[in-house]
Regions:
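NTP-dependent nucleotidyl-transfer catalytic core
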Residues: 1-158, 162-166, 172-180, 193
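Catalytic adenosine-cofactor/nucleotide-binding cores of aminoacyl-tRNA synthetases and other
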Residues: 104-107, 185-231
Length: 231
């Protein structure tokens, strides 16, 4: 989700995993969360995310795309690397269509039972946050239908959202070959705390946010235990 103006080293873990698939001949698809950034992922949070405006999101998406192309190589053809946002999917869909075509295939009880929703359940989950989970599922469904995407990769805190997409595809399409998902570990400190935007302690991929010197020193100064966790 484009809720900041730069990706972080946490995003880099998933991107490098996708890059390895690309090296072995797979087509890589990077989905940038435009519409979903307006709401924010409630997973493993004890409070609702702050609202992010559309103008800021468009600026962030532009920055994200430039950073992704640095990882994959700026000369990658669209047939090998597709970078797209998810705003058009939802802008072109009426609320009635969203509820009848998508909502009827999603089990609310399953979403509410997730461990990732526990903190938000206790504080009060908004309808918008619940809808976010359905939007995540629809993202995978759209890529499966129109881009022949068969595997979704995300951080292991996204496992529930990935499974929702897999279930939606199965219920709507009954595919001969099921959609699949895989997760990568989150970057954490030695004490287990997450390194990322939501923790307030990110290491940015933007030179303006984290200078090359600071980026270099972050890796040099890792403890042995943290270096093993990052490997």
């Amino acid at each position: 989700d484009a809720t900041s103006d730069s990706l972080t080293i946490g995003n880099l873990v998933a991107l490098m995993t996708l890059f390895r698939f690309r090296m072995h001949g797979a087509r890589a698809i990077v989905l940038l969360g435009e519409a979903t950034a307006l709401i924010g992922d409630p997973s493993f949070r004890d409070n609702e995310r702050e609202e992010c405006g559309r103008t800021a999101i468009l600026h962030n998406v532009h920055n994200f795309e430039q950073q992704v192309r640095k990882v994959f190589g700026k000369q990658e053809e669209p047939s090998h690397l597709l970078i797209r946002g998810n705003a058009k999917t939802f802008d072109d869909m009426s609320y009635t269509m969203f509820m009848t075509e998508i909502g009827r295939h999603v089990c609310g009880n399953d979403m509410l039972r997730r461990e990732s929703m526990k903190q938000r359940r206790e504080k009060g989950l908004t309808f918008a946050e619940l809808g976010y989970l359905v939007m995540q599922a629809l993202d995978f469904n759209e890529l499966w239908m129109f881009e022949n995407c068969r595997v979704q990769i995300g951080g292991n805190d996204q496992w529930g959202n990935i499974c929702s997409g897999i279930d939606l595809i199965r219920k709507r399409h009954q595919p001969e070959h099921p959609a699949l998902g895989m997760t990568v570990p989150l970057l954490t400190r030695a004490d287990g705390s997450k390194i990322g935007k939501s923790s307030g302690t990110p290491v940015w991929l933007s030179e303006e946010r984290t200078s090359p010197w600071e980026f270099f020193n972050y890796w040099i100064n890792l403890s042995d235990e943290e270096a093993i966790q990052h490997a």
